[in-house]
C-alpha cells in the first residue's frame, strides 16, 4: 500500500521533487520536496484509495473510534469521505477559534466523552496535529491517535507525538516515496543523496 500511494502522489504531482531547485515552504524552510495533497481531490480513484487506506489504518489501530475529526483545511475532505464510509459522526478543528459568531474552534459533531481519531493530510513537524489534539481534549474528547496520508519522517514529528504520548500512522512516507521515484526514473542516485541529506539535516 505504501508504495502504491507514493506512486499515485508522484503520478498526479501531489508530491513533486526538485533536488536542484529548492522550494520555499511557508515556514521559510528550503526544501527539495513539495507536498500538496489537496491535488488528490481531483482524482477519484486516488482519493478513494486514500480513503480506504486510512479506514484500514483506523480499523487496525483504533477500532473503538466514535468520531472522525479532520484538521482544517486539507484534512477536512478526507475526514468527510472516511466518516461517510464508516457511518460515523464527523467534525473538524480550526487552527484557532473563529473571531465571530460562536467563536468555535471545533465545528460539527460533539466530542465530549467520545473516542476521536484525527485525520491529517500531511505530517511534517506534527505541530498542526498537536493543535487539533489539544483543542479536542479541551472539549472533553478522548483522542485515540492521528492518521495521515504522508509524512516526511522527521525526527521532530516523532518527538512531537512522543511528547503528547499519542500514536500516529501514515499511508506512505518519505523513504517509500524516494524509492518509488528512483524506480520510476524520476530521480538519479545523486538526487537521492541530496534528498536523504536534506531530511537528515532537517531532522
Swiss-Prot record:
GO biological process: 'de novo' UMP biosynthetic process; pyrimidine nucleobase biosynthetic process
Catalyses which reaction(s): orotidine 5'-phosphate + diphosphate = orotate + 5-phospho-alpha-D-ribose 1-diphosphate
Keywords for the protein's UniProt record, in alphabetical order: Glycosyltransferase, Magnesium, Pyrimidine biosynthesis, Transferase
GO terms, molecular function: magnesium ion binding; orotate phosphoribosyltransferase activity
Top EC class of this enzyme: transferase
Keyword Transferase: yes
Binding residue positions for 5-phospho-alpha-D-ribose 1-diphosphate: 94, 98, 100, 120-128
Residues involved in orotate binding: 124
Keyword Glycosyltransferase set for record: yes
Cofactor(s) named in the record: Mg(2+)
EC nos: 2.4.2.10
SUPFAM superfamilies: PRTase-like (SSF53271)
Pathway linked to the protein: Pyrimidine metabolism; UMP biosynthesis via de novo pathway; UMP from orotate: step 1/2
Subunit-structure text: Homodimer.
Family, per entry: Belongs to the purine/pyrimidine phosphoribosyltransferase family. PyrE subfamily.
HAMAP family, A to Z: PyrE (MF_01208)
Function: Catalyzes the transfer of a ribosyl phosphate group from 5-phosphoribose 1-diphosphate to orotate, leading to the formation of orotidine monophosphate (OMP).
Protein name: Orotate phosphoribosyltransferase
Species this chain originates from: Staphylococcus aureus (strain Mu50 / ATCC 700699)
Organism lineage: Bacteria, Bacillati, Bacillota, Bacilli, Bacillales
Amino acid at each position: 500500500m505504501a508504495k502504491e500511494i507514493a506512486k499515485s502522489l508522484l503520478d498526479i504531482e501531489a508530491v513533486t521533487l526538485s533536488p536542484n531547485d529548492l522550494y520555499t515552504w511557508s515556514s521559510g524552510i528550503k526544501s527539495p520536496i513539495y507536498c500538496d495533497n489537496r491535488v488528490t481531490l481531483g482524482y477519484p480513484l486516488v482519493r478513494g484509495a486514500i480513503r480506504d487506506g486510512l479506514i484500514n489504518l483506523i480499523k487496525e489501530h483504533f477500532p473503538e473510534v466514535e468520531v472522525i475529526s479532520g484538521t482544517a483545511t486539507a484534512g477536512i475532505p478526507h475526514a468527510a469521505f472516511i466518516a461517510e464510509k464508516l457511518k460515523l459522526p464527523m467534525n473538524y478543528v480550526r487552527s484557532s477559534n473563529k473571531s465571530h459568531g460562536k467563536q468555535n474552534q471545533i465545528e460539527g459533531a460533539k466530542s465530549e466523552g467520545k473516542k476521536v481519531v484525527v485525520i491529517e493530510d500531511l505530517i511534517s513537524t506534527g505541530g498542526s496535529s498537536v493543535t487539533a489534539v489539544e483543542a479536542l481534549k479541551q472539549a472533553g474528547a478522548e483522542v485515540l491517535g492521528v492518521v495521515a496520508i504522508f509524512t516526511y519522517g522527521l525526527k521532530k514529528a516523532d518527538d512531537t507525538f512522543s511528547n503528547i504520548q499519542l500514536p500516529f500512522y501514515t499511508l506512505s512516507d518519505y523513504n517509500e516515496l524516494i524509492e518509488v521515484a528512483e524506480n520510476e526514473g524520476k530521480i538519479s542516485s545523486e538526487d537521492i543523496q541530496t534528498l536523504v541529506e536534506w531530511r537528515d539535516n532537517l531532522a
